[in-house]
Amino acid sequence: MPSCGACTCGAAAVRLITSSLASAQRGISGGRIHMSVLGRLGTFETQILQRAPLRSFTETPAYFASKDGISKDGSGDGNKKSASEGSSKKSGSGNSGKGGNQLRCPKCGDLCTHVETFVSSTRFVKCEKCHHFFVVLSEADSKKSIIKEPESAAEAVKLAFQQKPPPPPKKIYNYLDKYVVGQSFAKKVLSVAVYNHYKRIYNNIPANLRQQAEVEKQTSLTPRELEIRRREDEYRFTKLLQIAGISPHGNALGASMQQQVNQQIPQEKRGGEVLDSSHDDIKLEKSNILLLGPTGSGKTLLAQTLAKCLDVPFAICDCTTLTQAGYVGEDIESVIAKLLQDANYNVEKAQQGIVFLDEVDKIGSVPGIHQLRDVGGEGVQQGLLKLLEGTIVNVPEKNSRKLRGETVQVDTTNILFVASGAFNGLDRIISRRKNEKYLGFGTPSNLGKGRRAAAAADLANRSGESNTHQDIEEKDRLLRHVEARDLIEFGMIPEFVGRLPVVVPLHSLDEKTLVQILTEPRNAVIPQYQALFSMDKCELNVTEDALKAIARLALERKTGARGLRSIMEKLLLEPMFEVPNSDIVCVEVDKEVVEGKKEPGYIRAPTKESSEEEYDSGVEEEGWPRQADAANS
């Protein structure tokens, strides 16, 4: 058999061994390696390579090099080399060469170079001398690594419960009482609903995470495969922590990640074990709310005020712009898109939010039109069914062009929905159901079905002469007896009404409540106009009798608290026109001014000061046209 010493096999083997030895000397090898070396024909020789230094990943404070050998923070080190020496010694190390500050290795003092990656700005640096890798951390990153941050929404809720418990219902009620006058029953319902929403999140989120982990792990895996998966996850997290320079057992972040790995292991019972078990975890379900009441009673204001004091995302959506899928208008998914936007596009945080559906009565179906599709009424209600109950909604991503695939999946199971609407004419439907006398009419009328017929009957009743206080009391009494079948007759489909189990009727505002709205709450109407006049160095005084007269006018208009601002704008139009750039220092409004019997009273400054102001203002006004003419000429 001919010898192969002179053939190319020997040369290839020599090159392979040489490259292996060079790699081992550079530090790629992780321990003792047995390698077979080709020798004489038919024999093998084994050489044992010595242990090569490991490439370690640590997190240590690195110092900036300067010309005089002093670090950036002022602590000098004579043993460390200067920037010029390091650059002259390793000219091909890959430094930028722009003359800026360079990072030194905290182990040997040699200059560190940035690791070349596909990212233009990398935070990893390496030392060519001691083969150490480092992560450059900013001050903000260092602070974040010390403080334990929650790894998921469930841990964030648990941490919030431990550090600061959720506000009790009484505290939420007192906060709403500062901005909204009256409606005590609605405030109590909303306060309790928000508090229970916090508790439901705390109770349900861990169970959902376990179910999601079980789906991802596949329940058909054997215990051996589960153990292998668990070790793989631990290995991944350990390597990740080593790259970041954090020990998996010596740091709070490492402990939390290790705990997260253990939590992701499915621990729920499977198959026959579920049938044999007598104990099961309680899952709290949500109770969506429906607020109904006359216009201007404070439904939207309650939602806006409630959004300020919550630690969960809150979105207010207008149902009047919603249409069925495929038609011009906003899609139903835009409701969740607004919530996701309020959560800064954090999906887990958005899945714990609260959605307020305003003007929900405007999507009531219109009966009698069987040939046409009610795309803005019953079609929207049908699209909201699964949204209210809990489903996966595909929401377009941030800054996406609504192309295929650019969506985010949001689970609405734990999102609380609060709907509100005026439901004009609902009291007449309740009266007909109860066969009671309604505002002087003897026999029940043949009123048509649907929200349009009810609203038309209510509008016809408003145009007639009647006692305002009697109307308010009768409507409030009837709305307290509202039932699901009344809402169905109004135009809401039974499936939609059934998903709003808590129905809260709001009472109309009386004269006393309207007077309180003018003055008492924060951001009241009268203080707003006083602030406007104070910018012109003028005071606004409104007497108590004038406040009562304004409240009576608002009651007659039957527009609720919104009528107050309309009346105030009409009363103060002339004063707001006369006060700027004048000598008026006070405006007085009394009962006769509200009734239209006289003009508002003005209190002016002394005559001498006013004449000087008029003279100065006249010169300025005449001077501007003269200067403009001179410039044009």
From Swiss-Prot:
Pfam families: AAA_2, ClpB_D2-small
Catalytic activity: ATP + H2O = ADP + phosphate + H(+)
Top-level enzyme category: hydrolase
Binding site for ATP: 294-301
Effect of residue 359 to A: Abolishes ATP hydrolysis
Keywords: Acetylation, ATP-binding, Chaperone, Disease variant, Hydrolase, Metal-binding, Mitochondrion, Mitochondrion nucleoid, Nucleotide-binding, Phosphoprotein, Transit peptide, Zinc
Spans traversing the lipid bilayer: none
Bias (Acidic residues) ranges: 611-622
Main location: mitochondrion
Disease: Protoporphyria, erythropoietic, 2: An autosomal dominant form of porphyria with onset in infancy. Porphyrias are inherited defects in the biosynthesis of heme, resulting in the accumulation and increased excretion of porphyrins or porphyrin precursors. They are classified as erythropoietic or hepatic, depending on whether the enzyme deficiency occurs in red blood cells or in the liver.
Summary of subunit composition and partner proteins: Homohexamer that forms a ring structure; this hexamerization requires ATP binding. Component of the ClpXP complex formed by the assembly of two CLPP heptameric rings with two CLPX hexameric rings, giving rise to a symmetrical structure with two central CLPP rings flanked by a CLPX ring at either end of the complex. Interacts with TFAM.
Record's protein name: ATP-dependent clpX-like chaperone, mitochondrial
Species of origin: Homo sapiens
Gene, per the UniProt record: CLPX
